[in-house]
Amino acid sequence: MSQFLTEDFLLDTEFARRLYHDYAKDQPIFDYHCHLPPEQIAENYRFKNMYDIWLKGDHYKWRAMRTNGVAERLCTGDASDREKFDAWAATVPHTIGNPLYHWTHLELRRPFGITGKLLSPATSEEIWQRGNELLAQDPFSARGIMQQMNVKMVGTTDDPIDDLRHHKAIAADGSFNIKVLPSWRPDKAFNIEAAGFNDYMQRLEAAADTSISRFADLCVALNKRMDHFAAHGCKVSDHALDVVVYGEADETTLDAILARRLAGNQPSTEEIAQFKTAVLLFLSGEYHRREWVQQYHIGALRNNNSRMFNLVGPDIGFDSINDQPLAQPLSRLLDAQGLRNALPKTILYCLNPRDNEVIGTMVGNFQGEGEAGKMQFGSGWWFNDQKDGMQRQMTQLAQLGLLSRFVGMLTDSRSFLSYTRHEYFRRILCQMIGRWVADGEAPADIALLGAMVKNICFDNAQQYFAIEL
């Protein structure tokens, strides 16, 4: 029987242990996609307590707490920070089998150094007090934690109208050597059917100093804002494609669609597809020209619980997996980009694991141009960001493509404690390759496989995103 969370956690073969401890463990972190608030990095935020750093804004934990019968006031409501922490501590013993149980205790170990204790009502007081004592120290500020975890680069997620003043302040601070770069997330300019689209167009007009009445005007405004992002080091875009659509339209049709929407009319399903396709084709051309990487996060079904959405808003744990067809519209979208000689480096993530093989084979259709791994099947995302999901994604990537060219893990998180997910990923990667060796499916060549692991953990991403550190 193995002990829980030892130094060899998940490393069930000798070869896996060698790979992890000699090649993976000490690799820096290149966190190319996250949702950390850049203002907290700029001001080197000091966390008030363990709730502030660990529970605030964490929809993974809120879902588990609700499932455990915890009242909403103890999740997102007006309960005190300590009450919310205790409610989480009471939930943790019930999360065995859920990645939250592993993440919780990995996060206590790093960076807090709390080992040999499982979070529960019996230990919540001690862990609350010890964590709060550490949070008062310099190494546990926002920047301090990033430095402790050996982070070299983070890519935040930013709206085109953002002034990026926090990124500018971080870049100007010579005392901080971690790259914090913006990522372009233009969903609000893309989702023409959304209730707030017209208001957003007005805000985009102001940010770009451009009047928007025709489709070409929208492109000019977006281009100006991309110039602004590029000036602050942006090399990456990200799109939430909850449903992948494709529809062709000429500029006259696009002008009419936009004009009707700006006049307060809802677009038809066909018009939505035409507008979204046109925006993506325009943007992909700009990404290609600017040598940016584009990311598509595909397949979320958001805000399912209308009552709770009306009470507490979006992004608070009421999203799930969608099951819309994506193979044909995605193929047509990427093909159209290729026909324009404007297909940039692209990472595709799917939320529905049913679509793993669709994505795994789709990226192979558009590789080439002398660029290794140009098209990427992205790491297990959101509900797949757990042991089973990571194993499935990497297994299918290996079977359908080249695992050795994989750009690896990202936190996709709002929490400064989520860097242990890179450790979790690395252990699972080494476990998988170690088992291949044990089963005679891969050679016991530590130099060959060690270099592969090292590349997946850090080097591939740094090379792919072409960001100097």
UniProtKB/Swiss-Prot annotation:
Pfam families: UxaC. It catalyses: D-glucuronate = D-fructuronate; aldehydo-D-galacturonate = keto-D-tagaturonate. GO terms for biological process: D-galacturonate catabolic process; D-glucuronate catabolic process. It comes from Yersinia pestis. PANTHER family: URONATE ISOMERASE. Keywords: Isomerase. One of its GO terms (molecular function) is glucuronate isomerase activity. Belongs to the metallo-dependent hydrolases superfamily. Uronate isomerase family. InterPro entries: Metal_Hydrolase, Uronate_isomerase. It is an enzyme of class 5 (isomerase). It comes from the Bacteria. Its EC number is 5.3.1.12. This is Uronate isomerase. Pathway: Carbohydrate metabolism; pentose and glucuronate interconversion.
